[in-house]
Structures are given as structure tokens and as C-alpha cells.
């Protein structure tokens, strides 16, 4: 796995290409991330780097975490994430990772947390159809039958029903980087990404680049 970067979703907008075609993009504030730990196969059994993002006041973190960050001379960082890479020896403690690790046209995977919708019914959560709306029907948005009769005499596990919607880890694959602003550490990524503005995102080179 290649090294990625952490960032914050700022929102969506649109830009226009040379032909005047509008391209919907998500603006992501990425990094700068600080390398807080370098792991190798000799000492840890696998090669990876740990990066930190999101500077906060030291009082917001506990002492063990502050001590860990002090080893790399990093400021107080709220978010830590590990990226597996065979080239972990190419990174040093305290090194900054910025938006320029990506290039225009590159495919990336964006990992985040989907917007939480709370408790939702069958139609919204599972895209089920509704019941008749007239002619004396009293079953409009109700789920209807959820099982068989005496046999098996129970509801099968995994039955799609009403419940909590959203607020889960989501990966959107193979999104295209439309623009890289290295000075302001901004990425413009084609399409939508998980979460609402202000959400934490992890952006990595796409794993699956085929069709």
C-alpha cells in the first residue's frame, strides 16, 4: 500500500475544463501531515509509517500521546493514522507530507465516515417500495411481512429492517484528482466523498485501477 494523507472536507463546487464542461469537485484541505513513527520489518514485523494531522492545544491530549509525539518533535496532533509501505525507510521522523504527493489525473480512494441520519425507516434506509396510498389501505410506509409462518417461526438474521442509517466507514474508489494546489495544500477531487464539511478523510492512491 502506498502512503496516503489525512485531510478535511471543505465542501463541493464546480470548475470548468477547456471545453467549458462543468466538473463537480470536492475541495479537500490535506495535510500537512507529520511523520510521527516509522516502522520496519526488522523491529515491528511490517513496514509502515504513522502520520499525524490536526494540530490542537496540548491540554486536549493525554500525556502518553504527548510523549509519543515528542519523539518526532511533532506538535500536539489529534489524528494519527498508519499507512503500510515497503519504502518506510525513505521517511524520517518529523518529515512533512503535503498535497504534492498526488498529481493531476491520479486515481485515489477516499475513506471517511458517512453522514449519520439517525433512526430511519425501510424506505429511506433500504430503498423499499411503499404500500398503496388509497382505497382503504392502512399500510403506507410499514415494512409488511418480515418472515414466514410456523416454519421457521422466526425472523432470519440479516433481514433488512428499519434502524440506524449512516455514520459508518465508507470508501469511495477511483476518484480522479482534478487539481492540486500545493501552496494551500488543497486537492480538488472529482465527484462526492463521504461525510459533511469538516469531516476527516483519508486519501490514498487507488488500489484497483482496472475497469
UniProtKB/Swiss-Prot annotation:
It comes from the Bacteria. GO terms for biological process: translation. PROSITE patterns: RIBOSOMAL_L3. One of its GO terms (molecular function) is structural constituent of ribosome. Keywords: Ribonucleoprotein, Ribosomal protein, RNA-binding, rRNA-binding. It holds the Pfam family Ribosomal_L3. Residues 122-156 are annotated as: Disordered. GO terms for cellular component: cytosolic large ribosomal subunit. Part of the 50S ribosomal subunit. Forms a cluster with proteins L14 and L19. One of the primary rRNA binding proteins, it binds directly near the 3'-end of the 23S rRNA, where it nucleates assembly of the 50S subunit. Belongs to the universal ribosomal protein uL3 family. This is Large ribosomal subunit protein uL3. It comes from Nostoc sp. (strain PCC 7120 / SAG 25.82 / UTEX 2576). The lineage of its organism: Bacteria, Bacillati, Cyanobacteriota, Cyanophyceae, Nostocales. The gene is rplC.
